[in-house]
């Protein structure tokens, strides 16, 4: 397997299906894993596994919240982090899964990496980091964003960068979609500190344990 998000996905898959991850090794540009059916030294019956999953879900149902951040717009990004921080303040374990245009929110600016021609074209056309995000409405070639930030400053509204740091301080987990990163030519070195890379199985593993699941 060559997908970098596989390491988190396989762990989440084993946890949710009641199987055992015996080993996970990296070999140059690929990963090799060894799985064992069941947990530990004993195989788990389907009935026992179902009971375990139901119990785990019941125990954590009120504690988790997940957000899929698909949009790369400034206003939607701010709403995402406000909700995430609010949920964390209420005692929930919060996971934000950034995919496609949402990946621009968690990028660092001016990071030099080796890219193909198409990947370089994507980089040129996309915002460099969170400070360059457009508005979803009335952007007007960037003028709307400038005016919005001015109004926010005048009214003492926290900036997106502050909201992101506040969410990190509150323990919000941020995961970047490995498949979307590959499609859009974004490399792990370009992500801000503290962001993990994972796939859809990683997100679903978190989503099944929560009663708040949002798509923004």
Identify the role of each PLM range.
Residues 1, 94-100, 175-178:
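Short internal beta-strands
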Residues 3-19:
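Amphipathic alpha-helical interaction surfaces in cytosolic regulatory modules
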Residues 7-10, 104-115:
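N-terminal beta-loop-helix "entrance" segment that forms/cooperates
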Residues 19-25, 114-152, 156-159:
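A glycine-rich helix N-cap at a beta->alpha junction
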Residues 32-46:
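Core SAM-dependent methyltransferase catalytic element
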Residues 66-77, 151-155:
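Short, glycine-rich nucleotide/cofactor-binding loops
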Residues 78-92, 96:
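Histidine-anchored nucleotide/phosphate-binding helix
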Residues 141-206:
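A charged, amphipathic interaction segment
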């Amino acid at each position: 397997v060559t997908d970098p998000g596989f390491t988190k996905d396989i762990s989440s898959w084993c946890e949710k299906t009641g199987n055992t991850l015996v080993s996970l090794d990296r070999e140059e540009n690929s990963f090799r894993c060894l799985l064992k059916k069941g947990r530990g030294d004993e195989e788990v019956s389907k009935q026992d596994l179902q009971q375990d999953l139901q119990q785990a879900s019941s125990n954590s149902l009120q504690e988790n919240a997940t957000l899929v951040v698909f949009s790369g717009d400034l206003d939607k990004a701010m709403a995402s982090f406000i909700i995430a921080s609010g949920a964390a303040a209420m005692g929930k374990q919060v996971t934000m899964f950034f995919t496609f245009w949402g990946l621009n929110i968690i990028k660092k600016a001016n990071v030099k990496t080796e890219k193909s021609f198409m990947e370089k074209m994507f980089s040129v056309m996309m915002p460099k980091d969170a400070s360059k995000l457009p508005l979803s409405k009335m952007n007007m070639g960037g003028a709307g964003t400038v005016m919005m930030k001015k109004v926010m400053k005048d009214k003492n509204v926290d900036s997106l960068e502050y909201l992101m740091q506040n969410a990190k301080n509150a323990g919000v987990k941020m995961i970047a979609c490995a498949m979307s990163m590959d499609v859009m030519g974004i490399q792990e070195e370009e992500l801000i500190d503290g962001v993990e890379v994972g796939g859809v199985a990683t997100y679903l593993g978190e989503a099944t344990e929560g009663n708040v699941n949002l798509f923004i």
